[in-house]
Amino acid sequence: MTQEGTLTALREGERAQVAALLTEGGMRRRMQDIGLIEGTEVECVQKSPAGDPVAYRIRGALIALRAEDSARVLVTGC
């Protein structure tokens, strides 16, 4: 993945860097608090059988995000 897309496009084992957050207010703050800031590397670790939620490794922590939240994170591939 070398172009921009959302975090939902990552497959298990793929990594990308956060380019932007497509949300404002409290949700933006929550995402920043868990480490989703510009330039941070994110790895898709595991997708649940139904595809929602998805576990991501963010700054060494394993974080589960719902698909609707992952769709608000713009990433650029590695």
Locations of regions flagged by a protein language model:
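Amphipathic, hydrophobic secondary-structure cores in small proteins
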Residues: E12-E68
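Glycine- and charge-enriched low-complexity intrinsically disordered segments
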Residues: G51, A71-C78
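SH3-family beta-barrel domains
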Residues: M1-A20, T76
